[in-house]
Every structure is written in C-alpha cells, then in structure tokens.
C-alpha cells in the first residue's frame, strides 16, 4: 500500500479557492474557482483558484517589480534557495508521488520519477548563480570590453497536464536561477502537481515575495500572459496546435518564445534485433503513461521478416498489462486524462481500422481506461500513421529496406524523437543519422529525457530551440555587450 502520510507541501488549506504570489508572495482568494477531478475515480480531489486575464495582468506587474532585487541578490543566497526547495521535494517523496498519481492518472513509478527529477532540476539550478556569466573580449588600450548574460526580466511559463511537475520545473527552475521572475500558468487539470507544489516548495525555501506567481487558468489566461507587457519570454510546453497560437501571439509582440510541442515518433526495429527486447521497448514507448507523452512511440516500423512475430509478442504484452487506478500501485496503465481525449484516441483507432489497419489487441475502454491497443498493417495516409494519438496505441508498419524505413520515419511534419533497435550498432547509427529528429536513441525506445540533455524538436515539434542542460543559459538569458572607458574621449563630431 502506498505511503499516505501527510507532506507539508500538500496543503489544501493554502490553495483552496486561491492563487499564489501577489506582491507579498502569499496565497490570495481568486474571483473564480475550478474543481480538480481525479481521472481514475471521477471524484473531486481539490478546488483551486482559476485565473482570468485581469489576474494575469496584476501578477506580471508584481513579478516585474520583484525581479530586479532578486537578480541583484548575492549568488550564494540565490543558490541556497534552490537547495532548500530541492530538500522539500526530497522529504516524504511517497506522499508526493501518490498525490501526483491521483491528479494526473499516471502510475506511481511515473509520479516517483517526477518527484526525483524535480529535485534534481533544483539542484542543477542551484549551480547556475555560481557559474561564470560572461566573456572578456579583445579591446583597444584604455577600454574594457566584455559580454555578460542578463535575465529577460519576467518569464511566462505555460505547462501541460501529462508530466506537470517536471515540465513546469524544467522552465521555472532555470528561469529563476538566471535572475528572472516567473509567472507560471499550469494546466487547470493538474494545477497542484504543475504549480502549487512548486509554489509551496519555494515558499518554504524563502524565495523573495513576488518573484514567483502561480495562476492556473484556461486559454484566455494563457493569451494574457503571452501579451503582457512585462513578460520578456514565454516558455510553452504543450500541443502543436496550441503552440502555434502561442508562437503567433508572441511574434506579434516580438517576444522570445520557447516551444516544446508534439511528436509522431518512430521506433525502427531491424531484422537482426532481439525480438523480446524490441517488444519490451515498443510496449514501453507506446503504452507508458497511456501514451500521453510527446516522445511516445507513435510508430513501430519493423522489418517485414520479423514484423509478424514482433506483433505477436507485442499483442501478448498488451493483453496482460493491468489497467486501473494508479493509486493502487498494482497497474501498468491508468486513465486517459479526460473524456474528450479518450474519444479522440478511439476515433483515430476506429478510422484506421476502417482504412485497413488490423486491430490485433485492445481498442476498447471503460470509463477513462483505454486498453493497450495494437494495430498492424498501418500505412501512410491512415490516421494512426499520420497523427499524434496521445493514447496507448502501438501502430506497426512493415518495411523491406533500410532506405524505406528511413523514408517512413521521416514522413511526418514532426521531428521530436526517433529510435533504432538492431544487433549492428553501425547499421543502426547509419540509419539514425538520416532521421530528422531532435532526439535520437540507438538500441532504446523513443521515451527518454534527462535533466542534463538539451531537449527540443524540429518541424512541428518546436521552434528549433532546446531546453535543458547546456541550452538553459541560452534560453533564459540574453547577451549584453558592455564597454568601459576610464575617461570619456572626444569623437570626430
């Protein structure tokens, strides 16, 4: 049985009907509220404040007022805030994981991963203030010339429901660590995992008032955040359709924007692959967190000589993976996040079968629980081949030559993650180097991310930037060139 002891970060009295931040860094009543529904049980888990554009306008102004003092704080003092926030996430992790599992519908192992990665991101952020912040440049005698990293000012963060804690913290931590203030708008379906747990941790860690504002909201709040005059950068993680709107709106105001969007990711299985290993990787990539991951294995492109046997083994796994309430700690898959998303998944499966795909397993659901589904004979032009599904669907397409596998993998507007499994690493690498994706994994599946790697996609998967690891300084600061003369000199004018 999961540990259900109370955790100080889980405080319903703090966030019930409230938002976080303001000028004094406290919880304050919102004009509107929203129920948070547990996907597995359909029961109300919490009731939180819901931000509207006027709330966003106040929050961005308050963040802008607090930012200069935060950026000027001694580096060691800023670093200590992140270490204390990390310690808050490292305490009673089982209780945090259980809450995240209930709010997101993800299994406990996934929730435990979120808590651990959030703490790691904070530890990494603690090192940012103590790193070199610039370069000394060549200059003529009597003149000092250097370039330094300076914060954008206020960074607006819009985060999704699927991995809410990690995908919020991935932007919040480095943005704060580089001297910015942050206004965070988590998805209103997962406002606690994606926002208020972070607020509680930084509140406990002693982050100065006003530097972090957390306001769950809908699309109107997101648009207000993008357009707010005080916001210098937007970090958005979510669907390509929503990201395109964010990018267009940010472009009108000439704002920097980081877009981490969807994917249609291919796993290529070569004819010399170990099929037990390949089936295990394909199942994880397609079914983990019910396929609600931007890196999910949306296509399994298998050599024709092994496609039937790989399908058989994948079907066997799909039929035996337990589906149910993730809070039980005994299931491999939980629920889809909401009914609209479930119907979208089912519509893609049905349309693909009508177009000639073979339903080998699954394709059924009860409430929000969609069975792991295997489709074979999937071809280009079918919805299961072309579209991001965001559900637990393994779509298998055969190929005859390596060139055909490459062409099938690249036949998409997305470009996030690809993987190749085979006995010959040289052959797998030769294929991988011709795949158009931001992430490439050899002898692994497509779902992989660590705190230290640059993460970003091509095409419709993003705007060709990256976040994480060495990319964060580039994303959350900008260069300022500074020259200094001891005495002002005359000019030709």
Located regions from the model:
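Residue-level signal for inorganic ion chemistry
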Residues: 42, 78, 100, 122, ...
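Rossmann-like NAD(P) dinucleotide-binding subdomain of oxidoreductase/dehydrogenase enzymes
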Residues: 133-277, 399
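N-terminal Rossmann-like NAD(P)+-binding subdomain of aldehyde/semialdehyde dehydrogenases
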Residues: 1-143
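Conserved C-terminal structural/oligomerization subdomain of aldehyde/semialdehyde dehydrogenase
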Residues: 41-47, 231, 268, 322, ...
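Structural signal for hydrophobic packing residues in well-ordered secondary-structure cores
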Residues: 67, 71, 86-93, 97, ...
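Short, well-ordered beta-strand elements within core beta-sheets of diverse protein domains
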Residues: 45-51, 66-72, 157, 267-269, ...
């Amino acid at each position: 049985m999961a540990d259900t002891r109370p955790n100080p970060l889980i405080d319903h009295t703090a966030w019930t009907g409230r938002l976080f931040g303001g000028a004094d860094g406290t919880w304050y009543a919102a004009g509107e509220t929203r129920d948070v529904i547990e996907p597995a049980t359909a029961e109300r888990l919490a009731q939180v404040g819901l931000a509207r554009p006027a709330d966003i306008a106040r929050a961005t102004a308050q963040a802008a007022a607090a930012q200069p003092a935060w950026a000027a704080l001694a580096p060691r003092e800023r670093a200590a805030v992140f270490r204390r926030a990390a310690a808050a996430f490292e305490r009673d992790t089982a209780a945090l994981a259980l809450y995240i599992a209930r709010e997101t519908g993800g299994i406990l192992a996934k929730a435990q991963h979120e808590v651990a990665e959030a703490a790691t991101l904070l530890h990494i952020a603690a090192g940012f203030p103590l790193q070199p912040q610039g370069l000394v440049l060549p200059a003529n005698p009597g003149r000092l010339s250097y370039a330094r990293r300076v914060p954008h000012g206020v960074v607006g963060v819009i985060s999704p429901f699927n991995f809410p804690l990690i995908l919020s913290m991935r932007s919040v931590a480095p943005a704060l660590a580089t001297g910015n203030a942050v206004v965070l708008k988590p998805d209103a379906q997962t406002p606690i995992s994606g926002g208020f747990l972070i607020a509680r941790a930084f509140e406990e860690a002693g982050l100065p008032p006003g530097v972090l504002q957390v306001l769950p909201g809908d699309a109107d709040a997101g648009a207000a955040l993008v357009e707010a005059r005080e916001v210098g950068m937007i970090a958005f993680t979510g669907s390509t359709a929503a990201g395109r709107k964010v990018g267009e709106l940010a472009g009108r105001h000439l704002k920097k924007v980081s877009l981490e969007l969807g994917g249609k990711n291919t796993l290529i299985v070569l004819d010399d692959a170990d099929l037990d290993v390949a089936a295990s990787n394909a199942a994880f990539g397609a079914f983990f967190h019910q396929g609600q991951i931007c890196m999910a294995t949306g296509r399994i492109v298998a050599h024709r000589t092994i496609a039937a046997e790989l399908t058989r083994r994948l079907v066997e796994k799909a039929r035996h993976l337990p589906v149910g309430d993730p809070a039980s700690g005994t299931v491999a898959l939980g629920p889809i996040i909401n009914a609209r998303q479930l119907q979208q998944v089912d519509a893609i499966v049905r349309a693909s079968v009508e177009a000639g795909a073979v339903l080998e397993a699954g394709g059924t659901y009860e409430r929000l629980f969609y069975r792991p589904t295997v489709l074979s004979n999937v071809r280009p032009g079918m919805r299961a081949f072309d579209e991001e599904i965001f559900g637990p669907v393994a779509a298998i397409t055969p190929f005859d030559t390596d060139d055909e596998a490459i062409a099938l993998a690249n036949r998409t507007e997305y470009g996030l993650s690809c993987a190749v499994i085979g006995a010959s690493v040289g052959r797998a690498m030769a294929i991988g180097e011709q795949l158009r994706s931001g992430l490439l994994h050899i002898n692994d599946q497509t779902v992989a991310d660590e705190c230290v790697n640059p993460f970003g996609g091509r095409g419709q998967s993003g705007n060709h930037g990256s976040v994480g690891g060495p990319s964060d300084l580039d994303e959350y600061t900008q260069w300022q060139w500074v020259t200094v003369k001891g005495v002002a000199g005359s000019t030709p004018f």
